[in-house]
């Protein structure tokens, strides 16, 4: 007998964030599956630059869940957390003797899903 619980999932997406998706995934792996309040505390004290952006998106997902779906923030947990690669900004660094070296500035799209 297969019983599936009807989960009302709410999500928030941050797009074109100027961080490498590889470095963002390092933080997302730490909070995936955790409770909403616990994840906020973890993000507050982790030393990575990505934490600031992920925390903002997580707070937005919590507000969306509370306002749009009437869910309680204290009972939320993170069901989805992933970072996709965005477009790469291409710049040039001037070098000696008229040369130019390419610089690639990666961007990413962060998606967080929460439910009760």
Swiss-Prot record:
Pfam families recorded: Ribosomal_L22
Gene Ontology molecular function terms on file: rRNA binding; structural constituent of ribosome
Organism: Porphyra purpurea (Red seaweed)
Gene name in the database record: rpl22
Database matches in Gene3D superfamilies: Ribosomal protein L22/L17
GO CC aspect terms: chloroplast; large ribosomal subunit
InterPro entries tied to this protein: Ribosomal_uL22 (IPR001063), Ribosomal_uL22_bac/chlpt-type (IPR005727), Ribosomal_uL22_bac/org-type (IPR047867), Ribosomal_uL22_CS (IPR018260), Ribosomal_uL22_sf (IPR036394)
PANTHER family: CHLOROPLAST 50S RIBOSOMAL PROTEIN L22-RELATED, LARGE RIBOSOMAL SUBUNIT PROTEIN UL22M
Record-level GO BP terms: translation
Keywords attached to this entry: Chloroplast, Plastid, Ribonucleoprotein, Ribosomal protein, RNA-binding, rRNA-binding
NCBIfam families documented for this protein: rplV_bact
Principal cellular location given in the protein's record: plastid
Family: Belongs to the universal ribosomal protein uL22 family.
Compartments in which it is found: Plastid, Chloroplast
Function: This protein binds specifically to 23S rRNA.
Segments crossing the lipid bilayer: none
Protein name: Large ribosomal subunit protein uL22c
């Amino acid at each position: 007998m297969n019983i599936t619980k009807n989960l009302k999932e709410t999500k928030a997406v941050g797009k074109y964030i100027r961080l490498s998706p590889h470095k963002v995934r390092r933080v997302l792996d730490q909070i995936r599956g955790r409770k909403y309040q616990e994840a906020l505390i973890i993000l507050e004290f982790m030393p990575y630059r990505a934490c600031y952006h992920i925390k903002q998106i997580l707070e937005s997902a919590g507000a969306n869940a509370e306002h749009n779906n009437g869910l309680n923030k204290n009972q939320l947990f993170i069901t989805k957390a992933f970072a996709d690669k965005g477009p790469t900004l291409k710049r040039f660094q001037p070098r000696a003797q008229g040369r130019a070296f390419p610089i690639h500035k990666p961007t990413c799209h962060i998606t967080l899903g929460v439910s009760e």
